[in-house]
Amino acid sequence: MFDPKLKEALGRVQKPGRYTGGEPGSIYKEKDKVDVRFAFCFPDTYEVGMSFLGEKILYELLNSHENWWCERAFMPWLDMKAEMERLQLPLYTMESKDPLTAFDAVGFTLQYELSYTNILAMLDLAGITFYSKDRDDRWPLIVAGGPCACNAEPIADFFDIIQLGEGENQLPSICAEIEKAKKEGISKKQLLLNIAKIPGVYIPAFYDVTYHEDGRVKAITPNEPGIPARITKAIIKDLNQFAPPTNFVVPMVGAIQDRASIEVLRGCVRGCRFCQAGFLYRPMRQRDASLLNKAAQDLCANTGYEELSLSSLSTSDHGQLEELLDDLNEWAPKEHVSLSLPSLRVDNFSQSLIEKTTKVRKSGLTFAAEAGTQRLRNVINKNVTWDEIEKTCTIAFNAGYTSVKLYFMMGLPTETMEDIEGIAETAQKVVDLYYKNTNHAKGRGVQVTISCACFVPKPHTPFQFVPMDTAETLQAKQKHLLESVHSRKIKVNYHDSTTSFLEGVFAKGDRRLAPVIVEAYKRGCYFDGWEECFKYDTWMQTFADMGIDPAFYCQRPIALDEVTPWSHMDYGITHEYLVREYNKALAAQTTPPCNRACNACGANHLLGGPCFDYSQNLV
């Protein structure tokens, strides 16, 4: 039975299904019979959050413990947020409809820097005080994890616990400590000291940060005995020990990615110098084809989905991919399930691969060229040539494809306007290739879409040292790209440079940004990642009023020996390796994939030995 206030709110908003719960696959327990209650919060809309595979993994994992209950909460859209404030209806979870203050722990996933004000909005709607130092034992523990945890310093003061790395072992260990503390009456501080012993757990309150007079970080030091100077990320050494989820909560309102999805591998061997995920999730580990096939079949049967995505950073690098596709195609066509590989590589795309992924339904193909010239692709270590792009597109056109999306970035280190023109030239070559190919689909034209992101330098990558292009420079490059495209067969999409600027500020920011984020939220900034909601002028005025220069964080070079806000976080990649790759980038020198030869990045120490068996002649 809905609370009368909730019922009233639902009658006044668009898409009330975002807020009702009760979806197939939801897990319900008797709250009086569980020892730990965990609220998994996604700081964006229901449609975005329900597309997130990580939530599905941890939801099933935590709820597999009989005496723990993991529930879900999402950021309400503008209309529902206003109704909740008007009716004084606190933010609640989808399953029990209880307010977040009723939980032992409230966890946020940090997927995107521009979600930070949404985190504050959710805490505010829940009636939870923002700063960790102001919350005593009566409050839920506020937890964070996800890729942005690699430098969560701009929001570190809001969290009691930040998880670095992979959560499959971490989060259950945290819940076990919470359960123990409740039974033994342990204080919040002692509980945090106990949790700090869990691999990959960072307790921001146990570290002090000092600064040089010029604003750079001077030192980050522990302030409690036994706290490590550096926190090493948690890692799952053998993914086969954690089978993919075989049941999903099926959304009432269509999610952005509303399909069955299984993670076939984690990490990446490619070493693209711009790609933060490729460094954060090293080393690459894959699941066995037989395990994946069974999980996929069970997942589709349990959810009724008719599309299956084989997800990872680089699915076509899976060593048993063709074997897996053969296994999947034994049953998928009979069940009217289509297969999609969202992360295909130009350099290992094959006729056999395309045949095995188009037996039920064709869709457009997407490839990441990243840069418009070979020189710049070498700089960023994107080991792809035009010959490989040509071969791949020819295979696709022969198979009947008429739509190709090409991903690029602009604002890359050493980039010139010639490189921008190369983006348009590459797309035009693909159009020309289609019409030169006598086997292309008859009676249909080709559509090539250029999707161009603004490059944002990120921590733990070789490009963390480089300054980001200004918004004005990026806008000039975007204009030049549009002027360089002359075919109606080519469509150009690009990111807003001002939102990318703010992303860059938070990506490399420090703890002094926390008050700015709070003040910007109070001035009406939230849903910053949504173009229709982004208030750039409000952000800039807030920075100015608080005496903070945002360009200091993202538009100045970082010295190779500088202490960064994330220097105390160890993701397995050595500083020496990042410097070496940075210098190779400036010389336009490439580095081979690490499954062909070890490049001594340091990640092997996380596994306690070599990442790959090189005697197997891996490709």
For the regions a language model picked out, list residue spans one by one:
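Radical SAM enzyme core and accessory elements
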Residues: M1-I27, F38-F40, H486-V619
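N-terminal [4Fe-4S]-dependent radical SAM core
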Residues: K7-A39, Y46-E47, P204, T210, ...
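A short beta-strand-loop structural module common to alpha/beta enzyme folds
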Residues: N67-D79
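Glycine-rich beta-alpha loop elements in corrinoid/cobalamin-binding modules
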Residues: P76-P222, P459-D510, I517-E532
